[in-house]
Amino acid sequence: DALPDERLKLLFVCAHPAIDPAMHTPLMLQTVLGLDAVAIGRAFLVSPTAMGQRLARAKTKIRQARIAFEIPAADQIPQRLEAVLNAIYAAYGSSWEDAGGRDERAVGLAEEAIWLARVLRDAIPDEPEVRGLLALLLHCEARRPARRGADGRFVPLSEQDPHIWLAPLIDEAERELAVSAAHARLGRFQIEAAIQSVHAERARTGRTDRPAIATFYDQLTRLAPSIGAAVARAAAHAEVHGAQAGLALLDQIDAHSVVSYQPYWAVRADLLRQLNCAHEAAEAFDRAIGLTDDDAIRAFLLERRRR
């Protein structure tokens, strides 16, 4: 049995080739992992209403076409794997907003995502992207305790105390990343894990290799372009080449795609602030503040806006 866990089997079932590939991951998130249309829409940068309609249409087509939901054979797993990895990552990402670990459901979802990644790693040990995903989740989870101060305030990565990071998770992540690299088949999750690995080095060296991070984001946007990667690349290049360079990269992103993407406005606001463009920075901060439901992040952005 290639897939020993029932939830993993159901995830692969949702990636049936007769189903619209764009709906594979959303269906997994809703039907197997229990996310609602709001959380799924947030992950895919669309409104909850639009995502709900897409899910409803997909289910209607499944019923009308009488698609048989069967466990895939071992030789069918590779072509369904990417959607499953995306679903596990999106499930973990939906828990990331609960930085303080106060929401039991969010904590449970993060734990389940990491557990599923470990089970999948054991089931497909020679697939480097599975190990890359696990390494990425472990690196992120290692920093969760440092994302909130004792008073509940939001602490950005650059200001976190690395001594609070969970060393056992970082060590496990590094082992997974090393094994994945030995396969010499680079993929999106391995690059993202490598970026987090560079950040984790600060716990050992006291510094962050910003040029390396910028280079990895260059690779990521070429291999797996996305709005999130493009915004993060702009922020990374700003750290190396200055705010103007970062802003130029932000300006290359399609404006329509980032209208409701909060990280874009937060990065843009900070870069404009560094360039002493006070009015434009204030407007961007206001957009970023209006797009977050997290009180701690809102307070953090308000404080930045007042600088």
Positions of PLM-derived features:
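Amphipathic helix-loop-helix modules that constitute alpha-helical solenoid scaffolds
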Residues: 1-37, 46-218
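Start-of-helix register in tetratricopeptide repeats
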Residues: 129, 192, 228-229, 263, ...
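TPR/TPR-like (Sel1-like) alpha-helical repeat modules
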Residues: 278-296
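Alpha-helical junction/boundary sensor with strong preference for TPR arrays
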Residues: 117, 124, 184, 217, ...
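Alpha-helical residues within the helix-turn-helix
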Residues: 42-44
